[in-house]
Amino acid sequence: MQPSDVQATFRRLRQEADKVIVGLEEPFELLVIALLTGGHVLLEGVPGTAKTLAHLLQVKFTRVQFTPDLMPSDILGTSVFDITTGLFHLKKGPVFTQILLADEINRAPAKTQSALLEAMEERQVNLEGERHVLDAPFMVVATQNPVEYEGTYPLPEAQLDRFLFKVLVPYSGHDIEMEVLRRYHHGFNAHDLAAIGLQPVLTASAVAGARVYIQHVVVEEGILNYIVRVAAASRQSPDIVLGASTRAATHVLLAAKTFAALQGRDYVTPDDVKFVTPPIYRHRILLKPEAEIEGLDADAVVGRLLGQVDVPR
């Protein structure tokens, strides 16, 4: 596989996705980066991109609506007694898929949210003392309501850290919203993707091949140093209580390599690092109350960090 192959595949994905998704170029690109990096995504805002991506990949897709009464066994599965045989057998839960859409994940209590932890980190589930390996690729795309909504349970830090990206999906601008209305006026149905004529672009084996290629994308020592210095700056920032961890810096490295490959390059540039850092940091750093009172948010503070740290030449 060559850099141009990865880039061409991404362009085909984007072209097919455009049949369904209007705008949202960056959220879709971040979803593809997460898939090829082996990460998970937390979406805040309008959903819809995850189902489209799954349709383009020829992989299994499952959606779970998280609610306050959802139990861990509703996600992982449970043993069921078969009257005819007199034996228990495993009834697998919806986690046994390849792309899992966890809709409104912060509607469910922490115990249920944490049921995904092992699956997200280890790509396996332990049920009744038996280990069950999940099919590859396995990716969780979770949507959440903003924390000010009633009936929400904030995701615990351990759960947040499992997500490679937190992607903010904004409301559409005027031109994009007009295009959406035109499509619906002419009979568009977002719930019938087959009728739209979406063509699968990637197979599971192709995803695996792309991941192997991405591992060999070149990262110069200066780029590694840049990633480390940005992380260190977050820990020393007067606006931040909890800075980026080494794990976050590792995620920046891996995501930057994937983003470079999508651009048709076999090497990482500082701009690649700058592109992937905000969605990796925004759910990991904790701002001081004074910074929030000033009206700053995580993205503004991360933007400051990236502007302050010298870029390698």
Regions found by a protein language model. Give the residues of each.
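Conserved alpha-helical scaffold flanking the Walker A/P-loop in AAA+ ATPase domains
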Residues: 30-33, 81-101
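Canonical AAA+ ATPase core
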Residues: 82-87, 108, 112, 120-216, ...
